[in-house]
């Protein structure tokens, strides 16, 4: 009888078998009998797994007879779900949404909900002792171990008992043990990851997929700057770092062994079945290309980021810890972020859903108490007061992308946020005593809505209120899902910040030249900038100016050194200044000329309605300005993308924004939005170039603004996402990812290069070549339309083509292509002039000496030995880091050593006293400089990157013996600008 029963033993899926083993162990119960196994196998696998998962989660000691308990639950489940279900008349997506709503409302029911995890386990491959043992560890330990055995199967390199021995080790000791036992045998040294796992940083878990479907793993730590802000994407913040997997698919070359008619058959299988990491499954969720800036680059550098998320897990550790998406399908999971199934097209679906991938800082506010007020857009009207329609017969609007936020909410937003990071340290309490940001670029996820744009401070609004317009709502709420929970958040991307040093661009130089700005204007700027650059090695004012202008390169380290009186010929400082000089020259060659009395400001619409059609209101540090200003927006190519407008004082604006600063307001009058006239701009965060430079205003002659000449957009004939079944939707979305990642055309970049090439030749032709110039202008206008259409094509699902007749065969020499001609346009002259300058840069010093102030200070042998070992470890790690990912890995190593040195992310956050830090900094200085004497001056960089603020304070107190004055870098820039 026993032999017969063994032969007909019912096989269950791998994840159910694993869950049952976890139940036996947790509840101290004997395995279920064959009859119970038969009952479990009679219901859908996903329902069976959900049932045993809930059994596992019960408190130990509550179950006395596992067989009868499971059978009763199976009977309840069958009764509740009514399997088998008859087909109904609803569409697949309609049934799905209806089921989701039903399940949300019955979440407290004792009967299990019929959630679908969409992917089946293959046989019992998961049911191996080593994977079960891994499942008892927290995930970061699992991932680290698997990343140290690339190409190996865990069951073949280690036993389950060995894994369990490491279970309770602290992460540092665990990493060392795993590396010693496994990593050094199977993993390159450069891939060793000794991260600050408990530092609070965002960690990015990465999976690299080869064409044959094999995986390797890697974990990266987000570099969040000196303040260690918790910055990340909405996706990572909601689910947690370890539940989001960045997946990089290698391109499949035709010559590879995996090449077939369907080149990406293997990848599609992975998208369908998911990626197993231990006993966790991750499935395709969202992708995002590099945005407009990325599209302008060469296609070989194009990056499309693909993210999988954790769906289910049979790991013992995971089953003991609640997960917000347990039992949810991918379709359902997306709806918890936004009701994206309402998107009209597939292209729009993913373009809007990828808003959850913006790098943001969360506004810490109770979203349940916010008043979410929808207001109308401001329409453009003709002389008769009628709505003006665009080429697609939609109303033109003045308020595209901008709404309002109440003062109390705005005050909760820190000042100086840029791309989700705080540029300076300040608490919310400190911010309450300052003027709030005037404009806030944001992403808002609220009750199924996804909103994108800017909030203008409105002191007139009731507290805890935001007002959004239809142009800001990218995904609207599904009324049928009123009881469906969503991950609500107000995420800040950028605030209206003080302008940085403003530079021109190649496009802007070309357009200004076309508009009548003489070559002498640009060449004078060039000459003056180069002259000042030459003096940075002996003129402290020039050196400080350069250090401040490029302060983001070294966290203002060089500026600190200069300000405390360290000589300019100090080896590291002298070497760094030469790097700045090279950087400045490269910028100048690319047309990035610094221009005075010019600013980049975030734009919005005038809330008062006071501005006339040709007026703007500009608010700078000193308040509103008056007079003519030149206005432009990158990446404008059209001759009319540069406007001359009148900056006007608007008293009534103060009632809205008070004393908040740094923005440009456009009028809400006229038949067309001024923002749209300037390179198709809007007000969802676009930055506008504003200049009151007298030479530009005196000489520039504006042209008629751009008007699109391309035909209306074709209506999308494909099925809407809501008409697809969840399975069909996933297939279509992953196909879109493959196209974007491996087959996207680079129309934007090629069109921009083609335009610049034709524009370059156009600028040097005389009036006697009128016919030829007219033909060239016609081509440029075609390219401009193609370029602007291509910028918006992804979210519309349009395909934009660039005719070969518009592509040049030869390019200006300053573009540094293989096929080139010698350009004599202003851009060619700038390039040649910079290249011809043989600036007398000091050669690297063959004799590196220490500053007496540091060398003569006694340091204990204890600190010297400690720092010597520390520096040896650093050099080993940095050598390995430079073999891969160079800048990224090198910065990560530096940041890790700063963390260790200060016990915090940087000097500003350290709780260590200067008396504690001084001996360590001095010891490190002596050791590093002794090494640099033989290895080269570039090796001095490490001690200044890590301990620079401490050394500067020691020098100031010991050498200068002067009182320290506190000064903000922005004030110094203003004084030296």
From Swiss-Prot:
PANTHER family: RNA-DEPENDENT RNA POLYMERASE (PTHR23079), RNA-DIRECTED RNA POLYMERASE (PTHR23079:SF55). The gene is RDR5. Probably involved in the RNA silencing pathway and required for the generation of small interfering RNAs (siRNAs). Belongs to the RdRP family. Its EC number is 2.7.7.48. Keywords: Nucleotidyltransferase, RNA-binding, RNA-directed RNA polymerase, RNA-mediated gene silencing, Transferase. The keyword Cell wall biogenesis/degradation does not apply. The keyword Transferase applies. GO terms for molecular function: RNA binding; RNA-directed RNA polymerase activity. One of its GO terms (biological process) is regulatory ncRNA-mediated gene silencing. This is Probable RNA-dependent RNA polymerase 5. It is an enzyme of class 2 (transferase). It comes from the Eukaryota. Residues 103-122 are annotated as: Disordered.
């Amino acid at each position: 009888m026993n032999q017969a029963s063994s032969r007909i033993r019912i096989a269950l899926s791998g994840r159910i078998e694993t869950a049952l083993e976890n139940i036996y162990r947790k509840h101290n119960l004997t395995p279920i009998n064959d009859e119970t196994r038969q009952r479990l196998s009679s219901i859908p696998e996903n329902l069976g797994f959900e049932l045993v998962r809930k059994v596992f989660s019960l408190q130990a000691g509550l179950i006395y007879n596992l067989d009868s308990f499971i059978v009763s639950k199976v009977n309840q489940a069958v009764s509740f779900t009514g399997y088998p279900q008859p087909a109904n008349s609803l569409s697949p997506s309609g049934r799905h949404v209806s089921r989701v709503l039903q399940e949300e409302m019955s979440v407290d029911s004792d009967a299990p909900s019929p959630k679908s995890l969409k992917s089946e386990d293959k046989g019992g491959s998961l049911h191996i002792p080593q994977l079960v043992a891994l499942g008892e560890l927290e995930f970061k330990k699992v991932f680290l171990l698997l990343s140290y055995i690339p190409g190996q199967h865990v069951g073949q390199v280690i036993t389950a008992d060995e894994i369990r021995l490491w279970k309770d080790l602290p992460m540092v000791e665990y990493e060392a043990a795993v590396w010693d036992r496994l990593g050094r045998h199977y993993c390159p040294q450069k891939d060793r990851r000794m991260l600050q796992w408990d530092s609070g940083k965002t960690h990015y878990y990465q999976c690299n997929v080869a064409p044959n479907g094999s995986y390797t793993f890697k974990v990266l730590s987000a570099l969040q700057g000196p303040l260690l802000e918790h910055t990340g994407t909405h996706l990572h913040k909601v689910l947690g770092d370890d539940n989001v997997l960045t997946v990089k698919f290698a391109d499949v070359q035709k010559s590879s062994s995996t090449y077939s008619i369907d080149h990406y058959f293997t990848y599609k299988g992975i998208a369908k079945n998911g990626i197993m990491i231990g006993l966790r499954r991750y499935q395709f969720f969202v992708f995002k290309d590099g945005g407009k800036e990325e599209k302008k680059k060469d296609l070989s550098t194009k990056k499309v980021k693909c993210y999988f998320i954790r769906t289910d897990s049979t790991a013992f550790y995971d089953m003991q810890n609640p997960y917000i998406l347990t039992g949810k399908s991918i379709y359902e999971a997306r709806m918890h972020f936004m009701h994206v199934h309402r998107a009209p097209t597939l292209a729009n679906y993913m373009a809007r859903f990828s808003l959850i991938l913006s790098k943001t800082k969360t506004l810490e506010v109770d979203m349940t108490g916010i008043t979410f007020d929808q207001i109308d857009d401001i329409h453009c009207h003709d002389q008769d007061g009628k709505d003006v329609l665009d080429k697609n017969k939609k109303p033109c609007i003045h308020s595209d992308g901008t709404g309002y936020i109440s003062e109390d909410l705005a005050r909760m937003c820190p000042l100086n946020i840029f791309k989700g990071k705080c540029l300076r340290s300040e608490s919310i309490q400190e911010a309450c005593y300052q003027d709030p940001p005037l404009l806030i670029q944001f992403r808002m996820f609220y009750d199924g809505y996804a909103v994108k744009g800017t909030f203008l401070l409105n002191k007139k609004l009731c507290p805890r209120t935001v007002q959004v317009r239809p142009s800001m709502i990218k995904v609207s709420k599904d009324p049928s899902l009123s009881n469906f929970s969503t991950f609500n958040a107000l995420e800040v991307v950028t605030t209206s910040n003080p302008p940085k040093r403003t530079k021109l661009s190649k496009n802007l130089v070309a357009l200004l030249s076309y508009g009548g700005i003489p070559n002498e204007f640009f060449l004078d700027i060039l000459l003056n900038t180069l002259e000042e650059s030459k003096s940075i090695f002996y003129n402290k004012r020039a050196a400080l100016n350069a250090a401040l202008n490029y302060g983001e390169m070294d966290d203002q380290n060089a500026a600190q050194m200069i300000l405390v009186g360290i000589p300019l010929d100090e080896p590291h400082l002298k070497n760094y200044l030469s790097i700045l000089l090279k950087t400045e020259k490269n910028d100048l060659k690319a047309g990035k000329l610094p221009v005075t009395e010019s600013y980049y400001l975030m734009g919005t619409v005038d809330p008062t309605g006071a501005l006339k059609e040709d007026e703007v209101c500009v608010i700078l540090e000193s308040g509103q300005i008056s007079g003519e200003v030149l206005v432009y927006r990158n990446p404008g190519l059209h001759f009319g993308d540069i406007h001359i407008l009148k900056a006007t004082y608007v008293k009534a604006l103060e009632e809205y924004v008070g004393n908040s600063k740094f923005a440009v307001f456009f009028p809400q009058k006229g038949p067309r939005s001024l923002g749209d006239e300037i390179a198709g701009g809007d007000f969802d965060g676009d930055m506008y170039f504003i200049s009151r430079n007298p030479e530009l205003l005196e000489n520039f002659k504006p042209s008629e603004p751009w008007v699109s000449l391309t035909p209306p957009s074709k209506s999308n004939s494909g099925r809407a996402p809501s008409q697809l079944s969840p399975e069909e939707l996933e297939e279509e979305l992953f196909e879109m990812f493959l196209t974007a990642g491996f087959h996207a055309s680079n129309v934007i970049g090629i069109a921009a290069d083609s335009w610049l090439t034709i524009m370059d030749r156009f600028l040097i032709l005389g009036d006697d070549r009128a016919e030829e110039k007219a033909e060239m202008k016609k081509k440029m206008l075609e390219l401009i339309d193609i370029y602007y259409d291509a910028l918006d094509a992804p979210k519309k699902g349009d395909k934009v083509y660039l005719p070969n007749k518009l592509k040049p065969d030869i390019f200006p020499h300053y573009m540094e292509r293989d096929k080139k001609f010698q350009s004599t346009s202003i851009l060619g002259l700038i390039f040649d002039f910079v290249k011809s300058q043989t600036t007398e840069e000091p050669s690297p010093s063959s004799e590196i000496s220490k500053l007496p102030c540091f060398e003569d200070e006694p340091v204990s042998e204890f600190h010297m030995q400690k720092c010597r070992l520390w520096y040896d470890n650093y050099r080993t790690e940095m050598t390995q880091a430079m073999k891969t990912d160079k800048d990224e890995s090198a910065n990560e190593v530096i940041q890790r050593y700063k963390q260790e040195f200060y016990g915090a992310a940087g000097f500003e956050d350290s709780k260590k006293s200067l008396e504690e830090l001084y001996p360590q900094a001095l010891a490190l200085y002596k050791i590093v400089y002794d090494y640099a004497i033989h290895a080269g001056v570039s090796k001095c960089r490490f001690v200044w990157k890590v301990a620079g603020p401490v050394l500067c304070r020691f020098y100031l107190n010991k050498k200068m013996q002067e009182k320290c004055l506190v000064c903000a870098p922005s004030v110094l820039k203003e004084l030296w600008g």
